[in-house]
Amino acid sequence: MTTVLPAFWAVIPAAGIGARMAADRPKQYLQLGGQTILEHSLDCFLDHSALKGVVVSIAEDDPYWPGLRCASDLRIQRAPGGRERADSVLNALLLLHAQGASDDDWVLVHDAARPNLARSDLDKLLSELADDPVGGLLAVPARDTLKRAGADGRVAATVDRSTVWQAYTPQMFRLGMLHRALAECLVSDVAVTDESSAIEWAGHAPRLVEGRSDNIKVTRPEDLEWLRQRWSGRR
């Protein structure tokens, strides 16, 4: 039996500068396999038949976005980037609301610098969360031994990794629920590191959907080098 996947909007917060990459431009605009990291991050969504549209949150003075081929794609809309990730995502949700999107619509938020999302992971997320009352996120169980550090930089404790997961993206929630959670967090000055943390703060428990560990976020130069080696000859 063929599973019908739910329609969804994709939101890509792409206003960050990626200081840890120490590059001459924001990391999402670095080259990987013939196009930018951001374009790769968009591709998996643009190729999906259940996509309703994409909103990319871009800094107002961003000189790189207009030069991308995808910037003229009619399925992609641009929202203003904010000071923090949560501001950028909220601006994208406000744009969707203003254009008539429903509170019940699914929204998938994905990192601009996470270019190796597998179609199978995207379909798995959509399938497993289609009827979920809260939503959830792609994640990977922790594999390495984890240490908690003290203020002196020494090991304070070893963390039980059996219940620890690494949060990945996309993170999938209803538009209305995510909008309210992010807005309340910002008003209350709550630190929001990802969309799931806002939903958690609002009193909900997002579901963890196990994904591939190679769906990495490019944060440091060695991340990009790893992807370049992996993709060598792929395109």
UniProtKB/Swiss-Prot annotation:
Residues carrying the site annotation Positions MEP for the nucleophilic attack: R161, K217
Any Pfam family: IspD
Catalyzed reactions: 2-C-methyl-D-erythritol 4-phosphate + CTP + H(+) = 4-CDP-2-C-methyl-D-erythritol + diphosphate
Transmembrane segments: none
GO terms of biological process kind: isopentenyl diphosphate biosynthetic process, methylerythritol 4-phosphate pathway
Pathway as given in its UniProt record: Isoprenoid biosynthesis; isopentenyl diphosphate biosynthesis via DXP pathway; isopentenyl diphosphate from 1-deoxy-D-xylulose 5-phosphate: step 2/6
Enzyme class at the top of the EC tree: transferase
Protein name: 2-C-methyl-D-erythritol 4-phosphate cytidylyltransferase
Species annotation: Pseudomonas entomophila (strain L48)
Gene name, Swiss-Prot/TrEMBL: ispD
